[in-house]
Each structure stands twice: as structure tokens, then as C-alpha cells.
């Protein structure tokens, strides 16, 4: 895997991450993915969608970072944005709880889909720290190398951008706090929106209104969290 034209990567990210594609971990990760596919294993998201978070939100446009763990592992769900699913796929339980908090926090009606592309288009970097998964096998690609790549993404965006909001939901996301310059960015933490934990503090966290208040205080347009209908 090299940072050349064989990888469709948005130019600002390609430049910022160029050195990562020459690292030994990336060679090992590429080999692992090739071997998994050769063994007939189905990998999500589909290849062209793996870098969707970066391609949807150029480095200099990032305002908010939401961290996820690894992609959804059901057919047709993952498309490269954490917590989001492709059009026509029901919203998974964690996303339903995100919608419940949006309703409570900003009185935004719960949409009938789970496609969060409009957030990414407005500057919300929706990054899974592991960017691929095997079908029906959660965390199958954990510790295969993606963590080095996505740690570097977090470091780069923290360094390059002046005033970001990081939403860190759950212990895994919060373990990345050490990569973030909290002297200039707003770091919001909560339990994960999973049904197993959301009632312990995610529901009621107010992260969406707090994000927009911080953005406006720093001269940035707020995020329109209300999702457009999917046609």
C-alpha cells in the first residue's frame, strides 16, 4: 500500500499521511488484507469505501472528530464512517441512542435512516480506529496495523487544526485522549451509546449542543445535526 494513485485518498490527507504508507506496519497490513481476501473472507467496508471518512472530510475542513472502534460487520452496513450505515439499512442500536440524545439535546426528530454522510460533508471526521472488519467477526482486524495509521490521523488533525471538538464515547475512544492537544481543542467524553451503557451517562450528555456552542465561540459555523432524507 503506497500513497500513490492506486489509493483514492483526498489530496490533503494523502500529503499529510504520505510517510505512513512507507512504514513496515502498512506493508504487513496490506499483506494481511490480501491473504484474508485470498482465503475467501468477506471484508467490510468494500474496498473503495475504506477511506470514506478521509475522502468525505478534507483535513483543513475538519471541525469535529467522532471516534468509533471498528466497522459494522453485517452485510451492507459499513461504508467507512463510524456509526453510520448505508441507505436502506436500519439504524443499529448505538445509532438509535445517538438519535435519542439528539432529540433530547436539540429537539431533532429521529430520522428513518442511519446514513450520516451529511455530517461528514460539514466537517465531522467520523473515524473508526480500525478501518476494516471481517464479516460477522467483530474486532477481527484489531491490532493488525490500522491502530498506527488512525493514531497518526488523530495526531495530525490535532496538530493542524486550531479549534476542534473531539467526541470520545467509551473507554476505547477515551484511550486516544493522549494524542489530542486539550489546550486548544474541546474534548467531550461519555460512556458509549451502546444499549449496554448509554443509560449511564450518554443519554443526557449534551455533546451536540456543546459542540455547536464551542464552534460558534471560535468563529465556526455550527453543525446541522438534522439529517436530510435519503431518497
Swiss-Prot record:
Which SMART domains does this UniProt record tie to the protein? Answer: UDG (SM00986), UreE_C (SM00987)
| A GO BP annotation | base-excision repair, AP site formation via deaminated base removal
Pfam families referenced in this protein's UniProt entry, alphabetically: UDG
Q: Name one GO molecular function term.
A: uracil DNA N-glycosylase activity
Q: What is its EC number?
A: 3.2.2.27
Q: Signal peptide: which range, if any?
A: none
Cell location: Cytoplasm
This chain belongs to which protein, by name?
Uracil-DNA glycosylase
UniProt organism field? Pseudomonas fluorescens (strain Pf0-1)
GN (gene name): ung
Amino acid at each position: 500500500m503506497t500513497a500513490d494513485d492506486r489509493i483514492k485518498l483526498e489530496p490533503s490527507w494523502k500529503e499529510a499521511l504520505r510517510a505512513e504508507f512507507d512504514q513496515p506496519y502498512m506493508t504487513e497490513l496490506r499483506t494481511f488484507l490480501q491473504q484474508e481476501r485470498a482465503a475467501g473472507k468477506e471484508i467490510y467496508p468494500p474496498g473503495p469505501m475504506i477511506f470514506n471518512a478521509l475522502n468525505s472530510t478534507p483535513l483543513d475542513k475538519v471541525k469535529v472528530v467522532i471516534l468509533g472502534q471498528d466497522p459494522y460487520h453485517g452485510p451492507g452496513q459499513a461504508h467507512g464512517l463510524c456509526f453510520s450505515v448505508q441507505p436502506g439499512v436500519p439504524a443499529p442500536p448505538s445509532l438509535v441512542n445517538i438519535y435519542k440524545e439528539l432529540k433530547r439535546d436539540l429537539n431533532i426528530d429521529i430520522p428513518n435512516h442511519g446514513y450520516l454522510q451529511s455530517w461528514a460533508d460539514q466537517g465531522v471526521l467520523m473515524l473508526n480506529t480500525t478501518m476494516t472488519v471481517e464479516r460477522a467477526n467483530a474486532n477481527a482486524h484489531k491490532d493488525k496495523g490500522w491502530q498506527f495509521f488512525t493514531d497518526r490521523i488523530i495526531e495530525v488533525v490535532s496538530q493542524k487544526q486550531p479549534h476542534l471538538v473531539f467526541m470520545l464515547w467509551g473507554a476505547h475512544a477515551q484511550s486516544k485522549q493522549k494524542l489530542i492537544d486539550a489546550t486548544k481543542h474541546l474534548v467531550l467524553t461519555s460512556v458509549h451509546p451502546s444499549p449496554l451503557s448509554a443509560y449511564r451517562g450518554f443519554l443526557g450528555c449534551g455533546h451536540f449542543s456543546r459542540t455547536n456552542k464551542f464552534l460558534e465561540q471560535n468563529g465556526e459555523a455550527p453543525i446541522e445535526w438534522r439529517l436530510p432524507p435519503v431518497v
